[in-house]
Amino acid sequence: MHNNEQDRISPISRRSFIATAVAGLTIASVAASPLKHLQGGPIKIKAIAFDAFPIFDPRPVFGLVNQLFPEKGIELAETWRTRQFEYTWLRTAGGIFKDFGAVTEDALVFAANKTGVNLTTAYRRQLMDQYLALDVWPDVLPALETLKRSGIRLAFLSNMTGEMLKSCSRHAKVDSYFEHLISTERAKTYKPSPVAYQLGVDVLQLKKEEILFAAFAGWDASGAKWFGYPTFWVNRQGAPGEELNTSPDGTGKGMTELINFIR
């Protein structure tokens, strides 16, 4: 769950994302068409490496926070979300690794202490368990079906642990679409470290130019571009672009735009 303060999901957001008719897209055009890289000539995309959150919808986690702590839910959720990613970046910079589940729980404890809520053992477990049972966004299943038929290989490349990716994939019934569930825990670091992005190249055994990285957060899109991946930002929150001297090759609000981009 790859984000800075601009990329936080508002726990009170009720924005609906309408399922789109991507299943009707022409399969052959998706598979055969080259992609124009911003810094070079035409290239052929052979695989897509997804961050977890263009696929999985994390909003129920923050809805549960509001349900359990109605008076301080917004403050708790925002503090938790911010600290979660700050801890991954701090641990990456310091070279002291803890897996994403542990980091997420540490951030939750910090947020509870800061906001003064009574985080019981039962509440703590309930919130952490929600990260193991995320559903997909409404536009995901038809898009995955289209991509699968096209012959493009699909993988996750996420800061989430392997256990989280496997559990959510099975819960949401999308595990059959993904060839690899690549967690950055394999490298004992987090994105945007180049070592983390290199996992996609190593596991898929493709050139980085042949792997489209699909980011959820603006900072992750920037990190993937720094590494050298052609990059599409699935900007579901409508966040402004980062000021990091790079831009994704494409951007859109959902999976329809992603498929149109690679057609």
Provide a role label for each language-model segment:
Residues 1-12:
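N-terminal secretory signal peptides
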Residues 2-4, 20, 145, 157, ...:
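Asp-based, Mg2+/Mn2+-dependent phosphohydrolase catalytic module
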Residues 12-31:
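N-terminal export leaders
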Residues 29-41:
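Bacterial Sec-dependent signal peptides at the C-terminal "C-region" and cleavage site
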Residues 41-82:
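Active-site neighborhood of HAD-like aspartate-dependent phosphohydrolases
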Residues 62, 77, 81, 101-109, ...:
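An amphipathic alpha-helix signature
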Residues 123-135, 140-170, 184:
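Substrate-recognition element of Asp-dependent hydrolases with the DxDx(T/V) motif
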